Amino acid sequence: MDDTLNQANPSMSRRQLLNFFTGAIVATTASAAIYPATKFFMPPAESTDAEGGILAQDKIGHPIPASQILAQASGTRALIAGLAGEPTYLTVREDGTLDPMGIVNNCTHLGCTFPWNPVDQQFQCPCHGSRYDAQGSVERGPANRPLKLVQVQVKDDYIWISPWQETDPRTGEKPWWV
């Protein structure tokens, strides 16, 4: 008499089952290690609105509430991270609102960043001495083009920065950066 059980076709042997579970554990562990490494090398997605604008951020990437800048005195120029992280000046107007025209803080001569001089009421590039007026028009070279502009909008205490597409109000022409 035969005491063995007749198994016609077992669907999976014990060894195959253990190999499957081992492979699943290795794949899960590898995925868990690769995901953060991939996220590290990918730039963070910027919050955008319907017009292609992004939220104004501070230098470490936190959104800046409009109330924080509007609490400053009129004429104050706040430096924020704008489109593509470009440093951008926002101006508080006399009526307590933000100027809808932001000025990108990159000299059109060689791309240096520069401070606003409140005494002279000018942007002064320290690299080669270019001077720009309060609206970003060239007052003294070697730069020969006005500073790049961006559109500024406040919606629900958030500041949205979007590319300037209209005619440059300083020159009356199509912007050179479009």
Curated annotation (Swiss-Prot):
<dbReference type="InterPro" id="IPR017941">
    <property type="entry name" value="Rieske_2Fe-2S"/>
</dbReference>
<feature type="binding site">
    <location>
        <position position="109"/>
    </location>
    <ligand>
        <name>[2Fe-2S] cluster</name>
    </ligand>
</feature>
<keyword id="KW-0813">Transport</keyword>
<dbReference type="GO" id="GO:0009496">
    <property type="term" value="F:plastoquinol--plastocyanin reductase activity"/>
</dbReference>
<feature type="transmembrane region" description="Helical">
    <location>
        <begin position="17"/>
        <end position="36"/>
    </location>
</feature>
<protein>
    <recommendedName>
        <fullName>Cytochrome b6-f complex iron-sulfur subunit 2</fullName>
        <ecNumber>7.1.1.6</ecNumber>
    </recommendedName>
</protein>
<dbReference type="GO" id="GO:0015979">
    <property type="term" value="P:photosynthesis"/>
</dbReference>
<keyword id="KW-1278">Translocase</keyword>
<feature type="binding site">
    <location>
        <position position="107"/>
    </location>
    <ligand>
        <name>[2Fe-2S] cluster</name>
    </ligand>
</feature>
<dbReference type="GO" id="GO:0046872">
    <property type="term" value="F:metal ion binding"/>
</dbReference>
<keyword id="KW-1133">Transmembrane helix</keyword>
<dbReference type="InterPro" id="IPR006311">
    <property type="entry name" value="TAT_signal"/>
</dbReference>
<keyword id="KW-0408">Iron</keyword>
<feature type="binding site">
    <location>
        <position position="125"/>
    </location>
    <ligand>
        <name>[2Fe-2S] cluster</name>
    </ligand>
</feature>
<keyword id="KW-0479">Metal-binding</keyword>
<dbReference type="Pfam" id="PF00355">
    <property type="entry name" value="Rieske"/>
</dbReference>
<keyword id="KW-0472">Membrane</keyword>
<keyword id="KW-1015">Disulfide bond</keyword>
<keyword id="KW-0411">Iron-sulfur</keyword>
<keyword id="KW-0812">Transmembrane</keyword>
<comment type="function">
    <text>Component of the cytochrome b6-f complex, which mediates electron transfer between photosystem II (PSII) and photosystem I (PSI), cyclic electron flow around PSI, and state transitions.</text>
</comment>
<feature type="binding site">
    <location>
        <position position="128"/>
    </location>
    <ligand>
        <name>[2Fe-2S] cluster</name>
    </ligand>
</feature>
<dbReference type="InterPro" id="IPR023960">
    <property type="entry name" value="Cyt_b6_f_Rieske"/>
</dbReference>
<keyword id="KW-0001">2Fe-2S</keyword>
<dbReference type="InterPro" id="IPR014349">
    <property type="entry name" value="Rieske_Fe-S_prot"/>
</dbReference>
<keyword id="KW-0793">Thylakoid</keyword>
<comment type="subunit">
    <text>The 4 large subunits of the cytochrome b6-f complex are cytochrome b6, subunit IV (17 kDa polypeptide, PetD), cytochrome f and the Rieske protein, while the 4 small subunits are PetG, PetL, PetM and PetN. The complex functions as a dimer.</text>
</comment>
<dbReference type="InterPro" id="IPR036922">
    <property type="entry name" value="Rieske_2Fe-2S_sf"/>
</dbReference>
<dbReference type="InterPro" id="IPR005805">
    <property type="entry name" value="Rieske_Fe-S_prot_C"/>
</dbReference>
<dbReference type="GO" id="GO:0051537">
    <property type="term" value="F:2 iron, 2 sulfur cluster binding"/>
</dbReference>
<keyword id="KW-0249">Electron transport</keyword>
<dbReference type="GO" id="GO:0004497">
    <property type="term" value="F:monooxygenase activity"/>
</dbReference>
<dbReference type="GO" id="GO:0031676">
    <property type="term" value="C:plasma membrane-derived thylakoid membrane"/>
</dbReference>
<feature type="disulfide bond">
    <location>
        <begin position="112"/>
        <end position="127"/>
    </location>
</feature>
<dbReference type="GO" id="GO:0016705">
    <property type="term" value="F:oxidoreductase activity, acting on paired donors, with incorporation or reduction of molecular oxygen"/>
</dbReference>
<comment type="similarity">
    <text>Belongs to the Rieske iron-sulfur protein family.</text>
</comment>
<dbReference type="GO" id="GO:0045158">
    <property type="term" value="F:electron transporter, transferring electrons within cytochrome b6/f complex of photosystem II activity"/>
</dbReference>
<feature type="domain" description="Rieske">
    <location>
        <begin position="61"/>
        <end position="161"/>
    </location>
</feature>
<dbReference type="Pfam" id="PF25471">
    <property type="entry name" value="TM_PetC"/>
</dbReference>
